[in-house]
Amino acid sequence: MSPENQSSVSEFLLLGLPIRPEQQAVFFTLFLGMYLTTVLGNLLIMLLIQLDSHLHTPMYFFLSHLALTDISFSSVTVPKMLMDMRTKYKSILYEECISQMYFFIFFTDLDSFLITSMAYDRYVAICHPLHYTVIMREELCVFLVAVSWILSCASSLSHTLLLTRLSFCAANTIPHVFCDLAALLKLSCSDIFLNELVMFTVGVVVITLPFMCILVSYGYIGATILRVPSTKGIHKALSTCGSHLSVVSLYYGSIFGQYLFPTVSSSIDKDVIVALMYTVVTPMLNPFIYSLRNRDMKEALGKLFSRATFFSW
């Protein structure tokens, strides 16, 4: 059924950030800088992995896909948010809102699956180092990434199709910076029980289960590290997992409660701040985490700068 038959609302109004008008310019500059840092930083990660043959390993294969996902993730919401900060009428068409919500959920879930695949890679590398190349072969890596994309698509498509069946009668103001699924459900004048049931069920599949897999992986990793007799071996294992653990903490720390328990009452400002954490801050920090705490990435970055300096002369 077409949106025109289901809804009398042709557009939504995004309230945006809860800031005063005189603060708009400062926050616009801040978020523009953060967005550009996200795009350029993750593009640099992808470039380094592509150019340096030493980085053609399963770990960096997953990282390159994570970098692409982070760029796409931020690009779904931040450009529209920046544009709204420069205009007085912060509207978004019904179709654009549904599309934004679809891709937001898609890349959120894809992040979760990719981070889980990286945890499995670290588990094999530390717990089964002698069989690493046999287990983490190219076919398995491609399969894990392909499944991540397919499951993410299925998840976002299920939410989107269910949402298009709802009616939006009069209220069209979204107290958010983008078209958030939970905010849209609150505006609907239809029965949203099925939507909330699917939201909770899918949330368990794409958030809780991957998180449990990560915990189990690091449980085995921790047990293996404790059996390592040398401090050098422990340091190497920790340095291998440190970057990934930081990303896991940032990602799940900011979205776990809000995504899994969407009906829990919370202030609007808190929802916006949490959303900004995982749409702006986390994608921006990921390149720094992997470049500053990873020896291979720092060496590849040094080679790139040396090559650029050589050609500049």
Swiss-Prot record:
GO cellular-component term (any): plasma membrane
Superkingdom in the source lineage: Eukaryota
Keywords: Cell membrane, Disulfide bond, G-protein coupled receptor, Glycoprotein, Membrane, Olfaction, Receptor, Sensory transduction, Transducer, Transmembrane, Transmembrane helix
Membrane-traversing stretches: 26-49, 58-79, 101-120, 140-158, 197-219, 237-259, 273-292
Keyword Transmembrane set for record: yes
Topological category with respect to the lipid bilayer: Multi-pass membrane protein
Cell location: Cell membrane
InterPro entries: GPCR_Rhodpsn, GPCR_Rhodpsn_7TM, Olfact_rcpt
Extracellular membrane side: 1-25, 80-100, 159-196, 260-272
Cytoplasmic compartment spans: 50-57, 121-139, 220-236, 293-313
Signal peptide region: none
GO molecular function: G protein-coupled receptor activity; olfactory receptor activity
GO terms under biological process: signal transduction
Family per similarity comment: Belongs to the G-protein coupled receptor 1 family.
Function, as annotated: Odorant receptor.
Protein name listed in UniProt: Olfactory receptor 1J2
Gene symbol of the encoding locus: OR1J2
